[in-house]
Amino acid sequence: MAPKHQTPHTHAQIHTHPYRTLLTSFAAWKLFLFAIVLGSTLVGDAYDTSGGLLLQGPANGDAATRPAGLGTTLIARLTSWDAIYYVSAARRDYVFEQEWAFGAGLPFVVRTLLQGLEYVGIIDAPGAEGGRALVAEALAGILVANTAHLLSALVLYRLGQVVWRDQTLSLVAALLHVISPAGLFLSAPYSESSFALLSFSGYLLFALGCRAEGSSNSNNSPTRRDLYTISAGVLFGAATVFRSNGLLNGAPFALEVLRHLPAFVRRPTAIDTLRRLAALGVGGAAVAAGSLGPQAAAYLRYCIPSSSSGASDGEENLLLPRPWCQGYLPSIFTFVQQHYWNVGFLRYWTLPNLPLFLLATPMLVILVKSGVDSLRGRHLPGDAKAVDGESGRLLALIRSTAAAQVLLAVLAATTYHVQIITRISSGYPVWHWWLAGRLVQGDKTGSRIVMFMVIYASIQGALFASFLPPA
């Protein structure tokens, strides 16, 4: 049923042209956020000018004394907080150990994109210390982030259609992703929007595999089903290269393995069961590879002297293995998070951080509530409650994703810098569907949550552009 403020004609237009609706809503939201960024410059300089100095570069000399255009100002304001690390890594790879806390995915994509543009002669190769090169990387990072955000909304819309077969719910969920409380983090050179795109795409392929498994259509063969599953694992693995919490996307694979184990125990030689378990194993391994790959690269660089990158022959033997190299499961990511960023179980539970917990509480509650409701089968669209074999597999996918979402909230509250939950939650579809379901049903709580999302993203945008917390 259309909301009361919409005319039937407007409601029909939205449903007839869902992609146009998403595109126009996306453009309007981005213009709103960018206006906030530019408006923040009227208040004064950013609290920390690292982003602006990074983009100027030492080669520009008196660049700080020259007035910057709106475009340059926008780029500089968006290159704040962790974006500085991503842009720097895109320019010259990881140099300092603590930079390994930031996923290699975005720097790799930006670097590859710029190298491609250099190869075809669209842009010049960067100088040794050229400030313009860093502007190029920052701009490329912004373009990648915004493009990924748009595509992730479109993919989430398609995913909702495959899972729920409900256009209204799917469209509302995608629109909620557009106005995510992650706000400018999905517009700046950060990894969240790319993570969401890869995660939603992986879930879409996994859902298509669930549909193929239960279909009598000759085009939906077991081979096609298994290819969907493996491809989903590859995309989840790529998402993990962008953000380490992508490992939680392995939950559907684990649940599917458990679902097929009884059949394997009864008939260990059944070809279809063996093939299905093999596909799930390959897909799950691909998810894990997204985390293990960067860890292995770091181990070769820091723990094996002959492989140390960036050291000359005379310096190579002076490099001593780092403390984390001696661990039972050596992980540079775990070490730098603890050593440099003070990430660990209950380490963030201090009185000065209480305001950050209060800011994160609404999103934590939404994640836990929506996850628990989905695990219990509550607040699902009406059509989803008539479960056949195919829908049962999809509901298993939803519940495994909901469990991963709840685990993410628990980890954020106990181990992470809790305030990041508002942005990293953008890559999880269940809470979008849960909130969309409430809105479609006319639930006033859903409307209040949307109001919170818009207000939070607006205020956070002004603070981010001024290099002020929370980040």
From Swiss-Prot:
EC number: 2.4.1.-
Residue ranges of the TM segments: 23-43, 135-155, 169-189, 190-210, 227-247, 277-297, 348-368, 449-469
Biological processes per GO annotation: GPI anchor biosynthetic process
Topology term for the membrane: Multi-pass membrane protein
InterPro entries named among the record's database cross-references: PIG-V/Gpi18 (IPR007315)
Gene Ontology, cellular component aspect: endoplasmic reticulum membrane; mannosyltransferase complex
Top-level taxonomic group: Eukaryota
Location relative to the cell: Endoplasmic reticulum membrane
Keyword Transit peptide part of the UniProt annotation: no
Purpose: Mannosyltransferase involved in glycosylphosphatidylinositol-anchor biosynthesis. Transfers the second mannose to the glycosylphosphatidylinositol during GPI precursor assembly.
Cited PANTHER family: GPI MANNOSYLTRANSFERASE 2
Protein name, as recorded: GPI mannosyltransferase 2
Organism: Chaetomium globosum (strain ATCC 6205 / CBS 148.51 / DSM 1962 / NBRC 6347 / NRRL 1970)
Gene name for this UniProt entry: GPI18
